[in-house]
Design a protein with these regions (language model features):
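Topogenic membrane-insertion module of multi-pass membrane proteins
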Residues: 1-44, 48, 139-140, 152
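Intramembrane alpha-helical segments
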Residues: 4, 81-171
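Solvent-exposed interhelical
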Residues: 63-103, 109, 188-214
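A cytosolic-side transmembrane-helix exit/cap motif
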Residues: 63-70, 141-150, 170-176, 196-203
């Protein structure tokens, strides 16, 4: 019989810390390419971008946790890690509040980044926040359709790597777009593997992911 975690541990698990590598690696790759090109690293933009990316990832994870619970897709027979809302460790309202709080912290990081990088960062930041909510928190979640991999490729590859490079150099180059493409493919592959694991449960609950359609 599984033992339920305490409240702090429940929040820790709900944030899904293992997924943070997927959101932080694009920031590091973009910064590494910028370092190669410019010979320097701007540490404050790097740290703000890393924390902002992590908070968006955590907020998206929490929206996913409560969204899947409310839509009935997190059933007792699902494979993979146990989910905080579905298991009753945390209330749906509390998890949703945690998601918005995480997005608010990401927004605060974005204020500094906008001061440094200007209007392009406004577009990147707002699009990233909207996408994080829409992935599973919106009325028609992206994760419930066949475009999840495309979404992840764009935001974890092109946007995150390119944006991190831009924060360091205030320019863009073909080389960083190539690096962004490679990182995006890797991130999309993570979603593909995850959806393959959840194939049977997704099919029963009406999630038409690319794996289910194929």
């Amino acid at each position: 019989m599984a033992v339920n975690p305490g409240r702090l541990q429940a929040w820790f698990l709900a944030c899904r810390p293992k997924t943070l590598s997927v959101s932080l690696s694009p920031v590091l790759v973009g910064t590494a390419v910028a370092w190669h090109d410019s010979g320097r690293i701007l540490w404050l933009p790097l740290l703000a971008a890393a924390f902002g990316a992590a908070f968006i990832q955590i907020g998206t994870n929490l929206f996913n946790d409560v969204g899947d619970f409310l839509r009935g897709t997190d059933t007792p027979d699902r494979l993979g890690p146990r989910r905080a809302t579905a298991e009753g460790w945390l209330g749906a309202g509390a998890v949703r509040f945690g998601a918005w709080l995480s997005f608010a912290l990401a927004f605060l990081c974005g204020i500094y980044l906008v001061r440094h990088g200007g209007w392009p960062i406004v577009a990147i930041g707002l699009a990233s926040l909207a996408a994080g909510w829409a992935y599973t928190g919106g009325p028609k979640p992206i994760a419930y359709g066949p475009l999840g991999e495309v979404f992840v490729f764009v935001f974890f590859g092109l946007v995150a790597v390119g944006g991190s490079y831009y924060l360091q150099t205030l320019t863009m180059t073909p080389v960083v777009l190539l690096a962004a493409t490679l990182v995006g493919i890797h991130a999309a592959a993570v979603i593909t593997v995850n959806n393959y694991r959840d194939h049977d449960g997704d099919a029963r609950s009406g999630k038409n992911t690319l794996d289910v359609l194929l």
